[in-house]
């Protein structure tokens, strides 16, 4: 380790001990070193003994900085790995840090764009509109159109910090996985690797710009969701320019009510937006926490969601969508056998899984949930319980499903915060059933034909020539097959002749031996010569 890494490691250990996080350590040989540190570094006492363990963990991660804050946010979504008293406080982590100098932000943008900001923008505000651990946002106007925009810029000093902390995380994960077999269930190496990929993706604003453009295209002219326009000419790896929007934050219930918002319709539209993204587009915003969701203040009787920060998105393939939809429908029809079979069919659990045992495990977990009225059942927690049960049957972690579960919990939480009587199942079931009908039966066939229509329109003019070539090739193939068959027949005849001649020759040789014993020497010699002659003919027959 370099001196810088050792200094950072000491800082991490210091914060952990000051928040009493050594309480998280199991009774294991590996835990002796931190406990020895606790005794040796006697001046580092637990300064928050009165706080619950989950809150202490949250505060420690917040103090350690951006990499650890985002790591805690990711861990809060892995409820298949962590109990509620740990995951719930982590969900409250706030990704807000002190802003850096606006003049430095401007210089960073000018370097990325290759010229003074005044060339393209007016009214650039040096005071940031918002500041987070990875990036900072400033406002301005486009000179050509006078359109208000926001400029998002990556912090100039963030990459070395991230690289150093990720290196320490990887090292600690390897140590834990190697020395503590019982901790392998938490998959520390895989969790850190997944987090590293997510975090590094957020450092490339080109990815966020592409995601926002795609999501905006998917909801063009939609009354349900609006995604601000991105200006790709002014966007690159470290800077992104997009349309500035004005809205009411979705968590501002008082503000929404004061604006006369139709809260029931707003909540239902949130559910509709989620299922549309998942099942129609196979592309969904996977970071829909309240800070990224606003409501258009215009037309409060017909409210529209506004989605920001598309840095994290999820995708599902057609098989995942079909199995997910069938799982939901089977769940709410209490067909647990079908749920178990779908998990095996999809490959989410091993093919040799005992269906009866799996069905029984799902039934035990889910029946208590369905004892409540449907309007009180959490879709997200149904999915969570399903994944937790499947993990006991060796279900591999499916990153796309983890993102889906996190997003569903966000959407459901927001929906019930807006309208506590929201019946998610009543809103979602018609959507799922219609989607399933579009995937099977006559309607699906018609859609498939429509999808392939451009291909057939291109190929139809070539059909006569293709048909002629096929017939010509078929005729040539038949002739070739006839030739091969005739050759095969001739070969079989030759082999039969050879066997016959060999048999005759062998018989004559045996006869010559018998005749010698009976003093018919001349006849015996003639018979032997004839036998050898027949052998020669049989050998020639085999050689052809």
Curated annotation (Swiss-Prot):
It is a multi-pass membrane protein. It is found in: Cell inner membrane. Keywords: ATP-binding, Cell inner membrane, Cell membrane, Kinase, Membrane, Nucleotide-binding, Transferase, Transmembrane, Transmembrane helix, Ubiquinone biosynthesis. ATP binds at residues 129-137, 152. Pathway: Cofactor biosynthesis; ubiquinone biosynthesis [regulation]. The chain crosses the membrane at residues 496-516, 519-539. Pfam families: ABC1 (PF03109). GO terms for cellular component: plasma membrane. Is probably a protein kinase regulator of UbiI activity which is involved in aerobic coenzyme Q (ubiquinone) biosynthesis. This is Probable protein kinase UbiB. Residues 123-501 form the Protein kinase domain. Belongs to the ABC1 family. UbiB subfamily. The active site is at 287 (proton acceptor). GO terms for biological process: regulation of ubiquinone biosynthetic process; ubiquinone biosynthetic process. Its EC number is 2.7.-.-. It is an enzyme of class 2 (transferase). GO terms for molecular function: ATP binding; protein kinase activity.
């Amino acid at each position: 380790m370099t001196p810088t890494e050792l200094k950072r490691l000491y800082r991490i250990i210091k914060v952990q001990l000051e928040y009493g996080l050594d309480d998280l350590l199991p009774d294991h040989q590996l835990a002796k070193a931190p406990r020895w540190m606790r005794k040796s570094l006697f001046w580092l006492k637990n300064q928050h003994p009165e706080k619950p363990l989950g809150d202490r963990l949250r505060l420690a991660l917040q103090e350690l900085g951006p990499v650890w804050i985002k790591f805690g946010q990711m861990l809060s979504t892995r409820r298949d790995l962590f109990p509620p008293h740990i995951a719930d406080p982590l969900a409250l982590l706030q990704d807000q840090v002190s802003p850096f100098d606006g003049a430095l932000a401007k210089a960073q943008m000018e370097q990325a764009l290759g010229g003074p900001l005044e060339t393209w923008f007016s009214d650039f505000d040096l005071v940031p509109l918002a500041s987070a651990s990875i990036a900072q946002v400033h406002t301005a106007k486009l000179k050509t159109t006078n359109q208000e925009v926001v400029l998002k810029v990556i912090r100039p000093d963030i990459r070395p910090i991230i690289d150093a902390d990720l290196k320490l995380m990887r090292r600690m994960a390897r140590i834990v996985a190697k020395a503590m077999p019982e901790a392998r269930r938490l998959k520390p190496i895989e969790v850190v690797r997944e987090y590293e990929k997510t975090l590094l993706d957020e450092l490339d604003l080109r990815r966020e710009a592409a995601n926002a453009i795609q999501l905006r295209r998917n909801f063009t002219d939609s009354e349900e969701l609006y995604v601000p326009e991105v200006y790709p000419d002014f966007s690159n790896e470290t800077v992104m320019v997009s349309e500035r929007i004005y809205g009411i934050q979705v968590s501002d219930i008082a503000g929404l009510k004061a604006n006369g918002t139709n809260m029931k319709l707003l909540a239902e539209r949130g559910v509709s937006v989620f299922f549309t993204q998942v099942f129609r587009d196979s592309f969904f915003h996977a970071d829909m926490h309240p800070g990224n969701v606003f409501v258009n203040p215009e037309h409060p009787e017909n409210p529209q969601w506004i989605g920001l920060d598309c840095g994290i998105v999820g995708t599902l393939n057609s098989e995942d969508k079909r199995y997910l939809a069938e799982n939901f429908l089977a769940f709410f029809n209490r067909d647990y056998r079908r749920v178990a079979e779908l998990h095996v069919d999809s490959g989410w659990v091993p093919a040799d899984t005992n269906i009866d045992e799996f069905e029984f495990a799902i039934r035990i977990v889910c029946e208590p949930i369905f004892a409540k009225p449907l309007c009180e059942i959490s879709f997200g927690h149904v999915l969570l319980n399903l994944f937790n049960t499947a993990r006991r049957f060796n279900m591999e972690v499916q990153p796309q499903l983890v993102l889906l579960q996190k997003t569903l919990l966000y959407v459901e939480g927001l929906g019930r915060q807006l309208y506590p009587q929201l019946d998610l199942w009543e809103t979602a079931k018609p959507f799922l059933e219609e989607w399933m009908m579009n995937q099977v039966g006559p309607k699906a066939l018609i859609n498939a034909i429509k999808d392939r229509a451009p291909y057939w329109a291109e190929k139809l003019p070539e059909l006569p020539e293709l048909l002629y070539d096929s017939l010509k090739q078929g005729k040539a193939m038949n002739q070739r097959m006839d030739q091969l068959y005739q050759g095969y027949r001739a070969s079989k005849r030759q082999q039969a002749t050879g066997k016959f001649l060999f048999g005759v020759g062998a018989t004559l040789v045996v006869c010559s031996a018998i005749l010698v014993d009976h003093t018919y020497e001349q006849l015996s010699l003639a018979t032997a010569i004839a036998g050898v002659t027949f052998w020669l003919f049989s050998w020639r027959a085999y050689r052809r």
